[in-house]
């Protein structure tokens, strides 16, 4: 590995080694090679371009659509002793001119810009006059029409790079890209002989679960009662749901805030800051919240409603556990969610695309919704479902998700599955799920008589079953490939590959489980989730809390989020290593030279004070009674 890169990592960021995938990306950039890196949230994508940016001559331009992310990244870089700036609509024209003037004079190594800035005359003139060694495209999936967040302004990046006096290295980063989106990024950005680094989509510290539950409000209250001190995000699909849940929790005394586009800018900013600065542990929000939020200590993300795509879910759920600590991602599912999401898709604005593209995009969106519904209904491993969607190979159940830990009842539904096939064959693939299920149940509906399905052989064939059972069976048969739903606005049910069902040895086994609603009378049990703090003794945890208190004090003084001072993980390492001088403090993971100069003495004094007050305290589980490792 490049020695200078390792030294830069240690000096500025306080880490001894690169994480998985980072080293390969950094080396490729330093070899003047274009790069596309697909790395999960929390994998340290920013270090992949920040380290080479500090080593290479000239300036690195980082293109990001997220104002809040730019501001947080620049704050974090400045804290690490790195001169960086951002240029976006939050600055006045005079502030922008000053930033460009200082950059032209060599003050800044890294400049974050919004993609719209690439069409600005003043910025283009600046870009032609300075040495730009690298253009970094963050959230690179935004350049793909098949990505979940396509932004037309990203297409301008190609012309911007082309018109520079000398072609810089182009590096692109994203956390969410299917094979189709990956190829689109490579092609659209015109990457030359790129190194493609895919570290995988598996966030091993995240525990995924789906709860098919009626009383969602009770579940949320019960969950918060069991995690009272933890930071969490609760996503809702509509503003109305956000407001209703906020009012309910607020009235019950929960320290909670909210975020959606219906609130004015000032209120949104205040509520977001209250959450980021740890003043309010829980935020309820629409998906307008979170893009670019780098808060590392979010311990849980609850989806009150089903998101519209796996890409959205992976990205939103991925805001939990960015610090590597074990965290939970809970999706509360009901059939009503599908109806709401379908309504939101039907009302989507297509005024800026032609008719052919509208048809293709609608098909894509409906297919994504069906895949998301499949995730909510699968009885298989949830982690594998996510990984396989993104094209990753899996090797057996993960044993770290809700489905892997559930007790299922297995029922042979082969006879019923064959009747479903017969019914769909009789409809000749013309009708949707509701008609097929109604026919099989023998429902007395005027619509069925009107369509003539009451004359089918399959009419009433499964009248000894419930609608819920048949929905679950059809969902499982769809997952197995025996059936599929079309991707039109009004999707219909059609036959897939049914040849295995002709074999008498083939059985369709349906797995079911009993959903348990929260018991209001039962006292909440504390979470048993494993954390890094489990490595600390009671005394060690007391020191950790003292260091957190000091961190919050410093964060208020510096007007920045606490995690930018030091992450929880760094504070835990301080408790375990218990440094007594600056040299030992530099051995703590996440303590670089600049942060040592700024904050080292205050943290050393806090540790020394604690040790003087409790001289015989054993701080970590790895120590024996004499305090030896």
Task: Give the predicted meaning of each segment.
Residues 3-12, 16, 20, 24-46, ...:
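Helicase motor core with emphasis on the C-terminal RecA-like subdomain
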Residues 28, 303, 375, 573-574:
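Short alpha-helical segment immediately N-terminal to, or the first helix within
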Residues 91, 173-177, 212, 360-364, ...:
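Catalytic cores of large soluble enzymes that bind and process phosphate-bearing ligands
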